[in-house]
Curated annotation (Swiss-Prot):
GO annotation, biological process: formation of translation preinitiation complex; regulation of translation; translation reinitiation
UniProt-recorded Gene Ontology molecular function terms: mRNA binding; translation initiation factor activity
One Pfam family this sequence matches: SUI1
Keyword vocabulary terms for this entry: Protein biosynthesis, Translation regulation
HAMAP family: SUI1
Name recorded for this polypeptide: Protein translation factor SUI1 homolog
Domain of life: Archaea
Family: Belongs to the SUI1 family.
Key word Protein biosynthesis present: yes
Length: 104
């Protein structure tokens, strides 16, 4: 993975330290919720970003998916079922595929 800072790992072997670092990375969950009158909403949570950066990511996703959406309570809500396409777009934005999980 590259050189690791010894102060971060203490006396742990490099392999163990790398695994611990990977486990601490954000886990992005993409799920579908049904709202009243059967409307579907794609929810993206687990992006550890401040509110402004979260809004920028939401704006990019809404533009590429041609849909409406919002940012509420630290998560992105998009109108419609876009789970597979959102995963692909997040990967294109640089998020590691192993950290993106489609729930349900």
């Amino acid at each position: 993975m590259g050189t690791l800072d010894p102060s971060v790992c203490g006396g742990l072997p490099p392999e163990v330290c790398e695994q611990l670092m990977m486990d601490q990375q954000e886990l992005i969950k993409i799920k579908l919720e049904k709202r009243k009158w059967g409307r579907e909403v794609t929810i993206i949570e687990g992006l550890n970003l401040d509110n402004e950066r979260l809004k920028k990511v939401a704006k990019q996703l809404k533009s590429k998916l041609a849909t409406g959406g919002t940012v509420k309570n630290g998560r992105i809500e998009l109108q419609g079922d876009h789970r597979d396409r959102v995963k692909k777009l997040l990967e294109e934005m640089g998020y590691p595929p192993e950290n993106i999980v489609i729930v349900g």
